[in-house]
Structure formats: structure tokens, C-alpha cells
Amino acid sequence: MLIAMRFAPTSWLAVFLLTMLPAFASDPQRVLFIGNSYTGVNKLPEVFLEVVKSSGRQAPVVKSSTPGGRTLKQHLGIAGSMKLIEEGGWDVVVLQGQSQEPAIAEADEAVRKEFLESAAELCRRVRAKSPKAKICFYETWARHPDYWKAAKKGPDVGANPKEMQARLRKWYGVVAKDNAAMFVPCGDAWELNYASAAPVRLHTSDHSHPEFVGTYLNALIFFGRIYDVKVPAPKWSGKLDEAQARLMQGFAAQVLN
């Protein structure tokens, strides 16, 4: 799998990603997204659904809980998130932490402990009501390089985008491995884009949240991982022109193969 070779994560994670087999014997009927604004901005669940439909597959029921800025631990106390999990009968459940949470976890033991324990508890609760659910951890992306030029940068998320992405990859990989879940490498595709000769601006002006083109890229990767499609090329591309859509499809294919 290219992601493990290209980005050279720790050896155990490389083996995990290389050997992870397709997890879905049939198309899922019910998909749940639990996250925050990185899922909610541009309505990723709806974009994912459009990508699925335009591929000619039966559209699943898709629901979500995406209150802004929430950590995995906070979702355990959010009635809306817990109600959806307890509804049960989910085929796929996507879990996404606060955008800086896994990066801060690298250097902050308390944040790391909370992240690991909360991920495990969410998985436990999902499986209590949906025993056959495939759980996906949504690897998000580093801040835009301009974030590090600001006078006030906030908590320690790494010295630059490369270090921040490495932290996100590592800790989402850890919780995926520890909880027998799927790792969805959206952030790695963003990194490929920004390392390319003519990168597309995927971040909004806040250097954090996704433009629609970034959300489209994420949706392609979710489609590819959940449906075991190595080269996602849906007919639907929303507001993107054909050239942009094909470019994003290429980045998605690189992390899916």
C-alpha cells in the first residue's frame, strides 16, 4: 500500500496499513459520521453520499453528529452523538477527533491518555449496539503552512505541516490498530497535494478548515476505503471543474493503492 511506503510511518504501523484487508463483504446500508466541523463544513456526509450515488451504487442511509470543535471524549457526553450510536444497526461508523487533538497527544501525556481511552470507549459503545459495524478513524490534515507564520500559534501541534501530519498519522493509526478499526488516510492525500508541483489550496483562509475541493477529496477517500475502490472516479464532482476533480481523484488513488 503506497501510504505506508511513501510516508514511512513507524514500522508496526506500516505493517498494519500494508496488511489491512478490505473490510466490507457487501455495500453498507447505514453509515454514521461522528466528528466536528472538519466533517460538518461543506457537509462531508452528503458529499460522500453523492459520490456513492454517482458511482451507480445503492445509496446508504447516512446520519451525522458534527458539533464544532469537539474531542472524542466530549462526544461521549453529547446526547445527540450518543443517541445516534445507541440507535444501532450501523454498518459503518466514522470517528473523528478535534483537529489538533492527535497532534497535541504526541507531546502531552494527559491529552494522549484521553484520546486513546475515549477512542476505545466510543468503539466499545458502537459495538455494543452495532456488533457488525466497521469503525473508521478519519485521519485529518495538518494546518496550512501559513498557520506557522502567525504571531500566536497556540498549542504544540508540531513545528511545521510535515511534523503535524506525521503526528496525526501516528495517533490515528494507533487507535485504529488498538481497536481493530479502519484507518482512512485523508490527511495523507492533502499532504500529497501540497507536495505537488502545482498544489491546490484545500484550506480556507483560516488555515484549518476545508474548502469544498478538500471535502471532495476526503469523500473520495471514504468512498474508496469503504467500498474497496482503488481508483475512485465518480461522475459527480459538485462545484469542481473536470480538471480539479480528476486531480483530486488522482491524489485519492495514490493513498488508496
Locate each region found by the language model.
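N-terminal secretory signal peptides that target proteins for export/translocation
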Residues: 1-8
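Bacterial N-terminal signal peptides
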Residues: 10-22
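Alpha-helical cap/lid subdomain in secreted, periplasmic
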Residues: 82-208, 212, 224, 233
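Conserved SGNH/GDSL esterase-like catalytic core that processes O-acyl groups on lipids
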Residues: 28-32, 38-122, 131
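A generic secondary-structure boundary signal that marks alpha-helix termini
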Residues: 22, 57, 227-231
